[in-house]
Amino acid sequence: MEVARKALVAVAVLGGGAGVGSILFALVTPGELQKQSMLQEMPERDSRRRDEAVRTTELVMATLKDAAATKENVAWRRNWTVSGDGRSA
């Protein structure tokens, strides 16, 4: 009988905790209007931010293309501020 009582108390405590957690989650989640305003404020929606991301991607790709065109293994370069031909980067 004692084991059944402890099991019921444990189930009640866990169920109560889950109930409180569910209620708090429902209170914290934003409503539909707040979700829409948050989506409008995201950085990806800003055209300047998108242009900057495109430019950064272009620069990375150009750098990778230049690195692929050389015979130097840049992974073994000791001084990263100096390019393979001795010039400063």
Swiss-Prot record:
GO terms for biological process: ATP biosynthetic process; cristae formation; mitochondrial electron transport, ubiquinol to cytochrome c; mitochondrial respiratory chain complex III assembly. Residues 23-80 are annotated as: Mediates lipid-binding. One of its GO terms (molecular function) is phosphatidic acid binding. The chain crosses the membrane at residues 8-28. Residues 1-7 are mitochondrial matrix. Associates with the ubiquinol-cytochrome c reductase complex (mitochondrial respiratory chain complex III(CIII) or cytochrome b-c1 complex). Interacts with UQCC1. Forms a complex, named COMC, composed of UQCC1, UQCC2; UQCC3 and UQCC4; mediates MT-CYB hemylation and association with the first nuclear-encoded complex III subunit UQCRQ. Required for the assembly of the ubiquinol-cytochrome c reductase complex (mitochondrial respiratory chain complex III or cytochrome b-c1 complex), mediating cytochrome b recruitment and probably stabilization within the complex. Thereby, plays an important role in ATP production by mitochondria. Cardiolipin-binding protein, it may also control the cardiolipin composition of mitochondria membranes and their morphology. This is Ubiquinol-cytochrome-c reductase complex assembly factor 3. It comes from Mus musculus (Mouse). The gene is Uqcc3.
